[in-house]
């Protein structure tokens, strides 16, 4: 006989437990849906897809353009993918010279040879054959899916025609320049000082860039060079091309690849980053000698020294022309990439670079409707270079785990690239009348005002003076007064200092905002104990362009910033003292201090270039030989209750906070064995450099719910079809139709920003450009008048439509060919 009472008791208990689990299941956790994430290295996308099929991986975060694995994903119902548009490939040249330090001639130290190399390569061949059709030919640094490309499409297309594949023209230029440089052609091979000139090509071994390395070697061989291809992984190649001294001549060409860190609504920074010394601290960039006019225009675009969109277009167009002439790198393809995942996994994916380029991935990562558990992510590389927020790794592979560990004042919309408030409550933007700044109707957290002029208050802080150990004020530098084209007042949430904590338990304070500000200036001055020559390259420009900032309230924290620079989108006209004022990651003031002490002592350096010059270790807070050195300086800081820039920071950081901070860091290091202390939704449990693995865990004290950004489920990428007559008689009007949809449904007119078109005539020249007219949801028309068709040469023409929706930051293209008849 069974015990009825016991059975009922068990049943009731089971029901109660089920109710508890049901309630818990409906509760939204803080920070993340999952408990932990394991990131492992998997170099091969083919193997990664097999591991996804087997359930050994849940997401493969590295974007790929390989066609065979893509076909596998599309044919497996258990797998799915996200599409991205931000990956692109290039050929990076070693531009120093014309001779290396050992006297060898460097052909790519000759500007005209670099320029001619644009015509030496067939980008269509690379896109179709080497990338299997999952790429588009790329001629300049602008991503053709982003809005800036469409703004200058006429110039861009003309340059694409000028620098299209023309082997004979490239060969003629190279031959003339080599003769001019003193080289001789012996039995079909170039010699210098009696020795053959050998071109050393570093080719990435993990993907199609291996094939690109072989291809460029073949092309260079045809114009008379002996070539050697050295196949290396990214981690193996980086110390040579990026961190090594380019004057040593250990390489000539590198098959580079880049991933846009966001959906760029404004790529005005890109010329400064890729063609000048001002943005990148690595030795290769510090060796650049840009064309002076390009250098000047790059700075103008970076600081927005224009007043109209037409003036901006002229600067952009001229910069594109000069970029081809300078060509320290030439672009090959924009990749049509995918991020593979298991179908039951959901996670925010940025249209630029997928999962790894959005700050939202840790909060949105989830397996079905589950709460908790572990998700395993694969990455082509893991722990490539040291992590530090001043001058550490900028590899996408390192950014993936790093982005999970730090918080921000604003979030970049992964579909449009525009900003959304996170720790910021509101922003008041004031700009000078006439500037082309606009606000999205949905951005109720931003106000926009236009005024005749903006006067900077005399007590605003301008820049740091290391000799005075304080900020120079506007009144001191500009007693006659100072004006700025833009002012922004940033209001942080009232609960900022109550809810945000660092992973070691330290409450977030104003000191975490101020020390990075001081350090960023101080590193540029020779008299500073943390002086870095790479930072000095930008110092003069930074001082001249500084317009000041001022704290209006400490709690709640409110400050105003004046700027020479401004952005077309009102939402992007802000500063964020809370977030990442350095490029890569965030650290609390008390661990930044440890790096400073180690650099002052010559043991570690924040940047690779300074580490090379000091023969010191490149600082890494996450793992490696830096850690015991940092721990040693932590002991010093504890013993002395050390505070840098004491005369300035003492007003904001108390003795009690100093002692508490260092004690927390010590306890953290003793527990975790590293100093990577963030304030984001996940924390670094441990980095395993030998095993190539990173272990992240949910940060229990993170204040924000995991579903805060759940709206970013799927980007509404437009599907475009351009159609029209196949023939037109010159002098006759012709109409073209553009059908725009998403998943078969007509795209609403209110969500289409613009439809632009260009007409390429039979000679490949841009004949006309303009804008289509919206007729109905999902339907636009383009009309070429009889006068316009009369001017087209007889023969085949191509019309291209460029559709820019408002719901995503990427454009969609389609084209149609028609013949002009007499």
Task: Give the residues covered by each predicted segment.
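Extracytoplasmic/peripheral linker and loop segments enriched in polar/acidic and small residues
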Residues: 82, 114-115, 119, 127, ...
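Append "and occasionally in soluble cytosolic enzymes with long acidic Gly/Pro-rich linkers
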Residues: 109-222, 290-293, 318, 365-367, ...
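Extracellular/periplasmic solute-recognition and catalytic clefts
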Residues: 26-27, 40-99, 124, 129-130, ...
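Long beta-strand-rich cores associated with HINT superfamily self-processing modules
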Residues: 275, 339-386, 393-397, 683-684, ...
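Aromatic-rich, solvent-exposed beta-strand/loop patch
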Residues: 21-44, 72-87, 185-193, 362-368, ...
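Surface-exposed, Gly/Pro/Thr- and Asp/Glu-enriched linker/hinge segments
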Residues: 24-35, 66-68, 72-77, 107, ...
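Periplasmic binding protein-like
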Residues: 51-53, 57-67, 74-79, 222-278, ...
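Local pocket/hinge segments that shape ligand/substrate recognition
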Residues: 27-31, 41, 64-173, 191-193, ...
């Amino acid at each position: 006989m069974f015990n009825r009472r016991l059975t009922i008791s068990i049943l009731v208990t089971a029901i109660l437990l089920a109710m508890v689990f049901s309630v818990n299941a409906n509760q939204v956790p803080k920070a993340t849906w999952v408990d932990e994430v394991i990131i492992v290295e998997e170099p091969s996308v083919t193997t990664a897809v097999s591991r996804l099929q087997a359930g050994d991986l849940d997401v493969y975060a590295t974007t790929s353009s390989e066609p065979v694995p893509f076909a596998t994903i599309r044919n497996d119902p258990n797998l799915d993918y996200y599409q991205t548009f931000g990956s692109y490939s290039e050929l990076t040249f070693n531009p120093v010279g014309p001779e290396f330090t050992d006297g060898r001639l460097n052909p790519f130290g000759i500007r005209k040879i670099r320029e001619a190399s644009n015509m030496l390569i067939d980008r269509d061949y690379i896109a179709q054959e080497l990338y299997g059709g999952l790429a588009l030919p790329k001629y300049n640094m602008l991503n053709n899916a982003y809005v800036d490309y469409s703004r200058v499409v006429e110039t861009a297309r003309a340059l694409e025609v000028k620098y299209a594949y023309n082997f004979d023209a490239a060969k003629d230029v190279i031959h003339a320049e080599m003769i001019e440089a003193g080289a001789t052609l012996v039995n079909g091979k170039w010699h210098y000082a009696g020795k053959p000139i050998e071109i050393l090509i570093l080719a990435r071994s993990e993907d199609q860039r291996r094939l690109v390395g072989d291809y460029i070697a073949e092309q260079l061989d045809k114009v008379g060079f002996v070539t050697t291809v050295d196949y290396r992984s990214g981690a193996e190649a980086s110390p040579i091309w990026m961190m090594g001294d380019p004057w040593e001549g250990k390489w000539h060409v590198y098959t580079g690849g880049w991933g846009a860190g966001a959906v760029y609504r404004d790529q005005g920074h890109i010329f400064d980053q890729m063609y000048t010394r001002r943005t990148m601290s690595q030795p290769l960039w510090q060796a650049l000698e840009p064309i002076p006019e390009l250098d000047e225009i790059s700075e103008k675009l970076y600081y927005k020294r224009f007043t109209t969109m037409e003036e901006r277009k002229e600067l952009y167009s001229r910069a594109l022309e000069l970029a081809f002439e300078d060509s320290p790198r030439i672009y090959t393809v924009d990749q049509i990439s995918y991020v593979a995942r298991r179908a039951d996994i959901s996670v925010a994916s940025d249209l630029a670079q997928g999962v790894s380029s959005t700050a939202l991935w840790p909060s949105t990562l989830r397996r079905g409707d589950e709460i908790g558990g572990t998700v395993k992510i694969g990455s082509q590389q893991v722990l490539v270079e040291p992590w530090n927020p001043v001058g550490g790794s900028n590899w996408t592979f390192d950014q993936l785990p790093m982005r999970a560990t730090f918080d921000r004042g604003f979030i970049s919309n992964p579909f449009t690239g525009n900003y959304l408030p996170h720790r910021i409550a509101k922003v008041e933007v004031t700009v000078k009348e006439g500037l082309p700044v606009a606000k999205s109707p949905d951005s109720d957290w931003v106000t926009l005002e236009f005024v005749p002029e903006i006067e900077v208050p005399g007590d605003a802080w301008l820049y740091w003076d290391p000799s005075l150990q304080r900020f120079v004020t506007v009144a001191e530098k500009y007693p006659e007064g100072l004006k700025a084209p833009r002012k922004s007042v940033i209001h942080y949430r009232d609960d900022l200092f109550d809810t945000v904590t660092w992973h070691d338990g330290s409450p977030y304070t104003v000191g975490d905002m101020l020390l990075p500000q001081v350090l960023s200036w101080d590193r540029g001055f020779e008299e500073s104990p943390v002086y870095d020559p790479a930072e000095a390259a930008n110092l003069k420009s930074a001082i001249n362009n500084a317009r000041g900032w001022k704290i209006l309230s400490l709690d709640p924290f409110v400050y105003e910033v004046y700027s020479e620079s401004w952005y077309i989108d009102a939402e992007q006209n802000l500063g964020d003292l809370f977030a990442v004022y350095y490029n890569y990651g965030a650290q609390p003031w008390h661990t930044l201090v440890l790096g400073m002490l180690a650099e002052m002592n010559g043991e570690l350096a924040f940047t690779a270039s300074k580490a090379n010059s000091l023969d010191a270790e490149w600082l890494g807070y996450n793992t490696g030989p830096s850690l015991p050195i940092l721990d040693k300086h932590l002991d010093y800081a504890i013993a002395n209750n050390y505070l840098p820039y004491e005369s300035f920071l003492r007003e904001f950081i108390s003795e009690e906070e100093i002692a508490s901070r260092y004690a927390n860091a010590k306890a953290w290091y003793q527990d975790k064995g590293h100093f990577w202390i963030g304030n984001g939704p996940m924390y670094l449990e441990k980095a395993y450099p030998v095993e190539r693995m990173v272990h992240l865990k949910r940060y229990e004290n993170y204040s924000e719910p995991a579903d805060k950004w759940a709206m970013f489920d799927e980007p509404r990428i437009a599907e475009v079809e351009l159609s029209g007559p196949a023939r037109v008689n010159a002098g006759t009007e012709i109409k073209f139709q553009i059908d725009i949809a998403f998943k078969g449904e007509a795209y609403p007119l209110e969500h289409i920003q613009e439809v632009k078109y260009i007409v390429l005539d039979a000679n490949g020249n841009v004949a006309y450009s303009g804008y289509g007219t919206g007729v109905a949801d999902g339907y636009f028309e383009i009309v070429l008048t009889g006068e316009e068709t009369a001017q087209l040469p007889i023969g085949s023409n191509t019309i291209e439509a460029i559709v820019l929706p408002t719901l995503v930051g990427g454009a969609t293209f389609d084209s149609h060919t028609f013949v002009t008849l007499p």
